[in-house]
Amino acid sequence: MDSFDLALLQEWDLESLCVYEPDRNALRRKERERRNQETQQDDGTFNSSYSLFSEPYKTNKGDELSNRIQNTLGNYDEMKDFLTDRSNQSHLVGVPKPGVPQTPVNKIDEHFVADSRAQNQPSSICSTTTSTPAAVPVQQSKRGTMGWQKAGHPPSDGQQRATQQGSLRTLLGDGVGRQQPRAKQVCNVEVGLQTQERPPAMAAKHSSSGHCVQNFPPSLASKPSLVQQKPTAYVRPMDGQDQAPDESPKLKSSSETSVHCTSYRGVPASKPEPARAKAKLSKFSIPKQGEESRSGETNSCVEEIIREMTWLPPLSAIQAPGKVEPTKFPFPNKDSQLVSSGHNNPKKGDAEPESPDNGTSNTSMLEDDLKLSSDEEENEQQAAQRTALRALSDSAVVQQPNCRTSVPSSKGSSSSSSSGSSSSSSDSESSSGSDSETESSSSESEGSKPPHFSSPEAEPASSNKWQLDKWLNKVNPHKPPILIQNESHGSESNQYYNPVKEDVQDCGKVPDVCQPSLREKEIKSTCKEEQRPRTANKAPGSKGVKQKSPPAAVAVAVSAAAPPPAVPCAPAENAPAPARRSAGKKPTRRTERTSAGDGANCHRPEEPAAADALGTSVVVPPEPTKTRPCGNNRASHRKELRSSVTCEKRRTRGLSRIVPKSKEFIETESSSSSSSSDSDLESEQEEYPLSKAQTVAASASSGNDQRLKEAAANGGSGPRAPVGSINARTTSDIAKELEEQFYTLVPFGRNELLSPLKDSDEIRSLWVKIDLTLLSRIPEHLPQEPGVLSAPATKDSESAPPSHTSDTPAEKALPKSKRKRKCDNEDDYREIKKSQGEKDSSSRLATSTSNTLSANHCNMNINSVAIPINKNEKMLRSPISPLSDASKHKYTSEDLTSSSRPNGNSLFTSASSSKKPKADSQLQPHGGDLTKAAHNNSENIPLHKSRPQTKPWSPGSNGHRDCKRQKLVFDDMPRSADYFMQEAKRMKHKADAMVEKFGKALNYAEAALSFIECGNAMEQGPMESKSPYTMYSETVELIRYAMRLKTHSGPNATPEDKQLAALCYRCLALLYWRMFRLKRDHAVKYSKALIDYFKNSSKAAQAPSPWGASGKSTGTPSPMSPNPSPASSVGSQGSLSNASALSPSTIVSIPQRIHQMAANHVSITNSILHSYDYWEMADNLAKENREFFNDLDLLMGPVTLHSSMEHLVQYSQQGLHWLRNSAHLS
């Protein structure tokens, strides 16, 4: 070998080792100069008219160009003579000297070609455009396989460059490529086919599949000269692969072998492109390559390749599978790999023609070399994996494999091939995945199996799938955070997972085996799972679905679970798994599998029950085991009644996580209802897992805890489930529910008194609190009509029917499903509430009667009943004393969250009322626990400011519209200002989205009430970031805006419009009054300061400058001095105009400070005027609607200017609730 060859080899070695940079750079410069000279010399040999390399090789110049290239590269003897005569032949690596035997040269050339080809493949991946045109010359050069080494200097300049580069590559390939003989052969076969299909694609393919070439450093490709020499990039990869294997295997044969294995993995990414390339290139010179190959073996291999290539074009045309072609390739490739290892020399000839692609592969060579070690390992693994993958792929659907294949293929390609190849593989992951599958299948089939196109596709899918699963297993722990990023859905799922995990931990019943089996099933039936589970997952995943059809979601989840009954866990896991796939969150999927699977195991028993209740007859045969855990869970839930403290703690932890998330949802989502429901779902979900695995599973499937609650309460858990759920809903559950309502019910109470969320939430807490005695009474009195309410002491059922009547109108607006549940739940729980409330009222009747005024519509009875309804309120709300009411309302007003809120002590009345008669019958078996819980609740029940739970108001039964009027149950539970802020935003967003003006105004008014509560919480709490005064002032503006939406003074104004206006005026009056009280101290200070200032200034002004001139010093040019202090305002100007001897105090100009003080003082004192003005306006409107406001005053107690903000909020919310019912707004 010439000194230059040695230097070049050293250069490559040095480059791979990155040792001698200066030497390498010097060699590069020398090589560039030599190439430039050669190209200039070559110009003479070729017709100047042919600017072979003047234009990009991609431009198809027709047969002339290809013929020219073939002629240039094909005449090996001429090239040999030329190189031998050339003085610079020493610079060409692998160019045999006249005395050097040609066979070694051929070997070297083959190695170089294979190496360069491998290099070209990565580079072609990176620059497919270049590799495609280069591929044609490669074929030509293949024809002159010896020409590669000797044709390192192609007759044409561009060709010479390409050949020189190829020779350099070959030199590198000699060292490195010798290690890759097997890979070269495989690559050659693949390259031949691939080059025919499409050079760039082929290159990409080979970069992934024929990583044997990876051994070559990318230094040449990286050189600008290489970039300039597109012909080199255009070199056919087949030649390089065929040649490279002979010598390269010596150095890195094992790595090459691994590369081949990995190449099968990697190839899939690029094969689709090669298929197209094959169609294009096959016409060029693939057959010629075979003809020009120096060795018979090479020719035979090339011919086989060509034949395969000829087959492939139609297949490549059918690129959709793309795998079929690869399967064909893989067989020859595999054979070629085997042969290449055995027959390095013969294939050298073949490889030589293909060597032209080496230019493209040079860049990736170094990376490939670096990756060879990993590739070898991967190859070994892949061999085993292929077989496993085939089995899996046979069962797996091709689509699933494609999805997974893309990841594994990109993974394999990146590891086995250069970054370019990895990128290309990622670009065509689906196709590459199919290709890799086909290759793996073909390679295996080559052993003794015909290629199964369908099976190979399935195999790659399975292989990819298998690899993906393995990869997911590794990656999942890191990915779970992605869920949060993914969307509310992700956060919800995380929350759901955490609670589920907690439940699983509590239950300790989730079999790990079931989860793995589920995973396997998911892998095998991912398509089915993806189809159905995605739907199911979407239901939980998509908030809209969750809210809209929680029962349906539950049914779906149950059904999804049912299809694979063989594995009880599998159904649940499968559903989440598809969701994960659909979501694209692999870790999430895995987490879902475990957590959801566990949750499913623990909770599924109730899910089937819920499904049954939902009417979805879902049979979950494998779940008996799960049912046991469920039963245990129920037992544990019952135990939780006893150990409610621990459960509550857990729930509180879950709630703490949920609370911020619910807030986030509220903030992020414009539709307050959706956000609130989502937050509710999340909070409830987390709480549920702790309280009930059943509810967790249901919540996961349905996505709406409300609906889950309803489903569980109504029959979601079935007669069995209700009992278990009721037991589960002990004080701990109640506390949890209180928190959930804390986030959920408030908005709905305001928005929809009858909203399923409230009803279901109330139902839950009520269920836990029901007294069996009350329950026994309730069913009996359900049919009774509201008229029976003559005496509050009369049975609860009497008041309950009115509640049904009142509930139904509001429910009409609700969806049928909601209506059904509401009707069942609300009617039952309201009846229970009424019965309990009336029972309490009967006990309190003596005291309540003294407070209650006999108003029209049997207000005495109503009051006595209504007061008991809030039976745990510290004081009966007496309409007479607003202050006492205010104190009560402070206790109750902040949140109207349903009493069912998680307080273990949440209103017993609401709990009992929410209990259904059927619940009673169902719960009676467990009556002991329920009664205990109910008694505990009744004992501890402070009135919680749960969002208005609608308790049928007895006057409703007596009055005309009163039948629609229900008493809201308010929760005294303290809330943070942030909570009210979120609720207010949710309501405001809901109002923003509405079109109907009256409903819009109602929602704005309710949002204003939440803002008022927020301001009140700011007053009472430590939160000082935003002053209550500012909150109130902004609320005033919101109310004014709401009132402008619906005028009350026009001739078309309805009574509801006037009633709404009156309520808004009351709020404005009290807000202004409150604003004055907040700033009263400031007003007093301002008043004193102003009085003092004007006194002093008037005295001083008497001498030189009386205040007569509008308070300005007569001579002061700047009466409104920008400076705050009077002394500065005095200034030289003022003093000049006035007697300079005058003291600053004598100057009468009003400082800006004083002006600002006066303005602030006026604004504060104006609040009093506004307050009285609005109060008078409200009184005038109230006189026009005496009946409405008399009832409201009797029920809630009259509002006065001295009423507390809590009382005002509750009073207004009750009135708005009645207005909403009268307007049939949901």
UniProtKB/Swiss-Prot annotation:
Biased composition (Polar residues): 42-52, 251-261, 334-344, 396-408, 485-496, 692-705, 843-856, 894-909
Keywords, comma-separated and alphabetical: Activator, Disease variant, DNA-binding, Dwarfism, Intellectual disability, Nucleus, Phosphoprotein, Transcription, Transcription regulation
UniProt biased composition (Low complexity): 123-132, 381-392, 409-445, 550-561, 569-579, 668-678
Chain intervals for the UniProt region annotation (Disordered): 24-65, 116-164, 197-299, 323-496, 523-728, 783-856, 879-964, 1100-1138
Domain of life: Eukaryota
Tissue: Preferentially expressed in lymphoid tissues, highest levels being found in the thymus.
Modified positions (Phosphoserine) in chain numbering: 755, 881
GO MF annotations, alphabetized: DNA-binding transcription factor activity; double-stranded DNA binding
Record has Repeat as a keyword: no
GO biological process: embryonic hindlimb morphogenesis; regulation of gene expression; response to tumor necrosis factor
Keyword Nucleus: yes
InterPro entries to which the protein is assigned, alphabetical: AF4/FMR2, AF4/FMR2_CHD, AF4_int
Main location: nucleus
Feature: compositional bias, Basic and acidic residues: 24-37, 523-533, 589-607, 830-842
Protein family per UniProt: Belongs to the AF4 family.
Disease involvement: KINSSHIP syndrome: An autosomal dominant disease characterized by developmental delay, impaired intellectual development, seizures, short stature, mesomelic dysplasia, dysmorphic facial features, horseshoe or hypoplastic kidney, and failure to thrive.
Function of the molecule: Putative transcription activator that may function in lymphoid development and oncogenesis. Binds, in vitro, to double-stranded DNA.
Protein name: AF4/FMR2 family member 3
Biological source species: Homo sapiens (Human)
Gene (UniProt): AFF3
